């Protein structure tokens, strides 16, 4: 501990001594600079008073240069000391403060300009809005005006229709994915692409054929000209010799061009053949897949038809055996209740003598109603009451009409045999209809 305290004290004393030495050096440098300046001023004064005028300018220039050099040396000494560093730091702080003040001034000046700009934009916007309103008022049939005059109900209906269209599209796509028609659509698109590619390949073949024909014609013309020159070989001129040499030299080039054109033509034709084969195979595949899909849909529609027919038959049985008897019983019960109420009211309102003379007793009235109802039922036609000789198409159609009206509207009572007969007829007609639909 004592050693550390001693070291700290020594360090602090050394730092204090260094600071004092720096201050003394700075003070001495200042004193030296002042003395040098004073001597320079005195020398200038003596030179100005004692020397001639022609030597004054030279001496002033020399003295000014010497003073500048002295000032520079003094400035370097001051800058190298601690006080010079503190002075530099203070100057840097002052510069940063001045820069921040200028930035703040510019920032305060900018909002005013931005405010004027926004105000000008607002004025221009109001002018444009007023002009736009005037134009819209002059032309009320514009689409924007019609859109503005539309009610919320029409907008909701339009939105609902758009959502319904999207829903139908999604449902259709889902149904196609479920039934496998999406893959058939992919085959259809592939066939269309192959057709376009086949057209392009055929165009390329035509171009290659034209190039091959041109190459053959050029070579044949050169060979014909060579043959003509060879026929008059003994009468060649220097130009004929040069022409023969040129033709003989170009013959090899023409042969290469012809071979290249033939190769390109062969490649183009082979490409057309491959595309044609691929297109034919894609068309056959698409046709086969469409046949399978149509068979699947046809079988599904047949089963759906049979299911619908079964539901109709079930509803017919339910309506005939359950609903109609229940309705009939309820109607009869309500009718009997109304008759009883009416008879009781008549019995209470009239006296015994008036009832005996002018009214019919309740049992007789009910018996009369039952007999009239049974007579109406007995008047209904029935096929069992007819013999084979009495069967005609008119009687059969009348029977069907009356039975159908009784089934649909509840006009009278339907017998069990009539229900069975109608069931057999409807089943027979349903089987015929199902066979016709499935045969398609």
From Swiss-Prot:
It comes from the Eukaryota. Residues 91-113 have a biased composition (Polar residues). Residues 36-302, 438-440 are mitochondrial matrix. Residues 324-416 are mitochondrial intermembrane. GO terms for cellular component: mitochondrial inner membrane. It is a multi-pass membrane protein. Belongs to the SHE9 family. Homooligomer. This is Sensitive to high expression protein 9 homolog, mitochondrial. It comes from Meyerozyma guilliermondii (strain ATCC 6260 / CBS 566 / DSM 6381 / JCM 1539 / NBRC 10279 / NRRL Y-324) (Yeast).
